[in-house]
Amino acid sequence: MPQPRKRFAQHWLRSETALDQIIEAAQLNMSDLVLEIGPGTGILTRRLLPLVQSIVAVELDRDLCYRLAKSFGNFNHFLLLEGDILSLDLTTQLEQFPQFQPINKVVANIPYNITSPILEKLLGSIAHPQHPSYELIVLLMQKEVAQRIVASPQSKAYGALSVRTQYLAQCDYICEVPSKAFDPPPKVDSAVIRLTPRSLETPAINPQKLDQLVKLGFANRRKMLHNNLKSIIDKDHLTLLLDQLQINPQVRAEELSLEQWIMFSNLLETVS
């Protein structure tokens, strides 16, 4: 087992139970073309290979790339790309490998310190959704972040990340993975979530406007919505809009559901 590197936030998953849960959550079949981010020692890769049509694995650590190539290089349905998933242009990289595209699923144990950028890489943003979208994304991540992603309104964990992610995907909390399932154990527990990208029946008329409202609305959780949005909407106008939606004008951002955020954004767009 290679020595984990702190600068890459490496923690080797060693729980067969967790692997089983990840595999089950991914709903894999032999027609799937999978992207694995940060395969590390290859423990998940080895489980995925017999279950899918192909795997594109992206690994930043050069030493691990050498090990992965040695372990899986003989599999003709395995492609290893060395690089940073955040800056890598997968479309360009895969132009000469048509048999590995289009990727339809993502399965990954992602580093805690780049969770939000990876989510944006995979899903896009409210203002700029990822097109074409993946069919399904299964991620092992920090438990606290996973809880924030799937959180419901009026809960402590509910915030801008919840609204933004749930706008772009159905978010399912699959299971928790204790720190002892890793070597070395991280300081916090992890969780597996499944994201199913989707298009809402009633989307935002102006996604950029909704993105801005959510960002400003959650800027200070202790403040009421009219205080957080005063730079773009005066209090009287906001009160009138909320009244039309039958929402308490003293509301805070975390009290609004995704649907209410969309209705609020759309109403603001139509009357502006």
Swiss-Prot record:
<feature type="binding site">
    <location>
        <position position="11"/>
    </location>
    <ligand>
        <name>S-adenosyl-L-methionine</name>
    </ligand>
</feature>
<dbReference type="InterPro" id="IPR023165">
    <property type="entry name" value="rRNA_Ade_diMease-like_C"/>
</dbReference>
<keyword id="KW-0694">RNA-binding</keyword>
<dbReference type="InterPro" id="IPR020596">
    <property type="entry name" value="rRNA_Ade_Mease_Trfase_CS"/>
</dbReference>
<feature type="binding site">
    <location>
        <position position="109"/>
    </location>
    <ligand>
        <name>S-adenosyl-L-methionine</name>
    </ligand>
</feature>
<feature type="binding site">
    <location>
        <position position="59"/>
    </location>
    <ligand>
        <name>S-adenosyl-L-methionine</name>
    </ligand>
</feature>
<dbReference type="GO" id="GO:0003723">
    <property type="term" value="F:RNA binding"/>
</dbReference>
<protein>
    <recommendedName>
        <fullName>Ribosomal RNA small subunit methyltransferase A</fullName>
        <ecNumber>2.1.1.182</ecNumber>
    </recommendedName>
</protein>
<comment type="similarity">
    <text>Belongs to the class I-like SAM-binding methyltransferase superfamily. rRNA adenine N(6)-methyltransferase family. RsmA subfamily.</text>
</comment>
<feature type="binding site">
    <location>
        <position position="84"/>
    </location>
    <ligand>
        <name>S-adenosyl-L-methionine</name>
    </ligand>
</feature>
<dbReference type="InterPro" id="IPR001737">
    <property type="entry name" value="KsgA/Erm"/>
</dbReference>
<dbReference type="GO" id="GO:0052908">
    <property type="term" value="F:16S rRNA (adenine(1518)-N(6)/adenine(1519)-N(6))-dimethyltransferase activity"/>
</dbReference>
<comment type="function">
    <text>Specifically dimethylates two adjacent adenosines (A1518 and A1519) in the loop of a conserved hairpin near the 3'-end of 16S rRNA in the 30S particle. May play a critical role in biogenesis of 30S subunits.</text>
</comment>
<dbReference type="InterPro" id="IPR020598">
    <property type="entry name" value="rRNA_Ade_methylase_Trfase_N"/>
</dbReference>
<dbReference type="Pfam" id="PF00398">
    <property type="entry name" value="RrnaAD"/>
</dbReference>
<keyword id="KW-0698">rRNA processing</keyword>
<dbReference type="GO" id="GO:0005829">
    <property type="term" value="C:cytosol"/>
</dbReference>
<keyword id="KW-0963">Cytoplasm</keyword>
<dbReference type="InterPro" id="IPR029063">
    <property type="entry name" value="SAM-dependent_MTases_sf"/>
</dbReference>
<dbReference type="InterPro" id="IPR011530">
    <property type="entry name" value="rRNA_adenine_dimethylase"/>
</dbReference>
<feature type="binding site">
    <location>
        <position position="13"/>
    </location>
    <ligand>
        <name>S-adenosyl-L-methionine</name>
    </ligand>
</feature>
<keyword id="KW-0808">Transferase</keyword>
<keyword id="KW-0949">S-adenosyl-L-methionine</keyword>
<keyword id="KW-0489">Methyltransferase</keyword>
<feature type="binding site">
    <location>
        <position position="38"/>
    </location>
    <ligand>
        <name>S-adenosyl-L-methionine</name>
    </ligand>
</feature>
